[in-house]
Amino acid sequence: MTGSVRLRGLAVGTALSLCLTSPALADGMAKFEKLIKPQLPEGSLTYKSGKGLGDNGFVLEGVVVTPPPDTPSGKTEPIAIKKISVEDFDFTAFEKQTPPTYAKVRIEGIAVSDKPAEGIDLKEMAGIDKFNMDFQVDYRLEPERKTLTLNKLELDLSGLARLELSMILDGVSPDIAGDPDAAMNDATLRTATFVFEDRSILAKAVPAIAKMQGGDAAATLLIAKTMMAPLRTGQGPKAQAAFDAIESFVDDYKKPKGPLKVTLNPPDKVSATALSSAAGADDVIKALGLDVSYSGTVPHPAPKKQ
């Protein structure tokens, strides 16, 4: 909801992922090689081949990124990436050290090991071996209209799940990128859509969570519903329908009958600050014009007031 935070997050995330920092050269690849690559720590980014993609884009293939360690004595494993495609990027804004007003980037084949971080063993926890991940971001800020359009922010975990977010925010400008408080008050949501497509991750994650809790999957689902019950109590039909969809999706964790989709279409301008005063689920749903849909939804009895 905070326009500036989202804009800054998109800008920084894109820049760090692609190591972009400025330029005013004619070819996207030339901009990268002449002005960006020399600034990177030695050995932090390598690639087998690269080519320009118009004035503001480039493609790198056979990429290996070695992130800096968390501590001076620490060590990090290199991350293999099949391809990074920058179709369009606002080099001019970045050269001025201001948030890029547009970016369209696709990162394909990010290799994720079964031990992505210290103390985390996905294979032991959930039977998840190493897998590939794709990432896409496509956004544009119109400073004159103070409108941020996120056409797509997508994370695709091969064989596990896909998450996609799109939205339009009003009241967003580069000037408030460093002022979260102003963004909370000024940025308003026009519309948003979130899609969670499960392919197998819930079937792996639910039993894994149950194992960590010392129980079984049924007990874990019961705990989740028990925690959700107070949020449902005393709420109206629209709130109950939203909770029905969520609970049905979780009930079908072994094999969901389609994606879970959340859409937001506020009837009036709504900011994060305004939402903070919501008294319950009904208020939130009314303010956001929220709708949760799942093709396998079945009614669940609403908890009664005590």
What are these regions (language model features)?
Residues 11-21:
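Bacterial N-terminal signal peptides
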Residues 1-12:
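Bacterial N-terminal signal peptides that target proteins for export
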Residues 20-306:
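Glycine-rich, small/hydroxylated-residue low-complexity segments
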